[in-house]
From Swiss-Prot:
Binds 1 pyruvoyl group covalently per subunit. It catalyses: L-aspartate + H(+) = beta-alanine + CO2. Its EC number is 4.1.1.11. Heterooctamer of four alpha and four beta subunits. Its cofactor is pyruvate. Pathway: Cofactor biosynthesis; (R)-pantothenate biosynthesis; beta-alanine from L-aspartate: step 1/1. Catalyzes the pyruvoyl-dependent decarboxylation of aspartate to produce beta-alanine. It is found in: Cytoplasm. This is Aspartate 1-decarboxylase. GO terms for cellular component: cytosol. The keyword Cytoplasm applies. One of its GO terms (biological process) is alanine biosynthetic process. Gene3D superfamilies: 2.40.40.20. It comes from Francisella tularensis subsp. novicida (strain U112).
Length: 111
């Protein structure tokens, strides 16, 4: 049996763009992805702090150091530019494994 645990969390990501007619996904600055240990095409949960919307999608790598956080496709209807997001990924692990440390990136404080 495996359990789902928090793997990575990007806190206070600011939406910088949205493209309703793109096929889907969230575009994230590749440097932020690296800091958070999130890879391209990884499934993530997106939580909008401004309106409470939650959705799941996959990640597209954005330009490094661009600070890009853009929701694409139907997900673009769940946010506005300037909204604050939590972007969360999970891992499936053996429940007997101890000391699982998620990678936390806080864009508000820079940690």
């Amino acid at each position: 049996m495996l359990i789902s645990v928090l793997k990575s969390k990007i806190s206070y990501a600011t939406v910088t763009g949205k493209d309703l007619f793109y096929v889907g996904s969230i575009t994230i600055d590749s440097e932020i992805m690296k800091q958070a240990n999130i890879i391209e095409n990884e499934k993530v949960q997106v939580v909008n702090l401004n309106n409470g919307a939650r959705l799941e999608t996959y990640v597209i790598k954005g330009e490094p150091n661009s600070k890009t956080i853009a929701l694409n496709g139907p997900a673009a209807r769940r946010c506005e530019i300037g909204d604050q997001l939590f972007i969360i990924s999970y891992a499936q692990v053996d429940p007997t494994r101890e000391n699982i440390k998620p990678k936390l990136v806080d864009l508000k404080t820079g940690d």
